[in-house]
Structures are given as structure tokens and as C-alpha cells.
């Protein structure tokens, strides 16, 4: 197991952790059925923007 040679400063530690923040997924609303969906995904009603992509269940 590795053993550190010198103690890392708070600044160096925080710079390393600067990219670790979590972000929430953004939701958009379907223009046809009004349900919430993930952006750039086909809605459960079968619409992707203005295009009908698949048949609804």
C-alpha cells in the first residue's frame, strides 16, 4: 500500500475535488402529452420533438 511522502495542503486537496460535484438531471416537458422526460430522449408517447418515432403502447 502506498504511503504519502508529504502532507497535501487544503488548497491542493480542494483543487483535486473540484470536479467531483454531482449535478441533477435536467427534465423537459413533452409537447404532445405534457409528461416530464429526460432531454434528448424519446417520450413514452412515442414523440421526439415534433417527430413520431415509435408507436405508443
Curated annotation (Swiss-Prot):
GO CC annotation terms, alphabetical: cytosolic large ribosomal subunit
One family name in Pfam for this protein: Ribosomal_L32p
Sequence ranges of Basic residues compositional bias: 7-18
Stretch list, region Disordered: 1-20
Keyword Ribonucleoprotein applies: yes
The keyword Transferase is annotated on this UniProt entry: no
A GO biological process held by the record: translation
Record-annotated membrane-spanning stretches: none
Origin: domain of life: Bacteria
InterPro entries: Ribosomal_bL32 (IPR002677), Ribosomal_bL32_bact (IPR044957), Ribosomal_zn-bd (IPR011332)
GO MF terms, alphabetically ordered: structural constituent of ribosome
Alphabetized UniProt keyword annotations: Ribonucleoprotein, Ribosomal protein
Family label: Belongs to the bacterial ribosomal protein bL32 family.
HAMAP family (UniProt xref): Ribosomal_bL32
Protein's name in the database: Large ribosomal subunit protein bL32
Lineage of the species this protein comes from: Bacteria, Bacillati, Mycoplasmatota, Mycoplasmoidales, Mycoplasmoidaceae
Gene: rpmF
Amino acid at each position: 500500500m502506498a504511503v504519502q511522502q508529504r502532507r497535501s495542503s487544503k488548497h491542493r486537496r480542494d483543487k483535486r475535488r473540484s470536479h467531483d460535484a454531482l449535478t441533477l438531471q435536467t427534465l423537459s416537458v413533452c409537447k404532445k402529452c405534457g409528461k416530464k422526460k429526460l432531454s434528448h430522449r424519446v417520450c413514452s408517447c412515442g414523440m421526439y420533438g415534433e417527430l413520431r418515432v415509435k408507436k405508443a403502447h
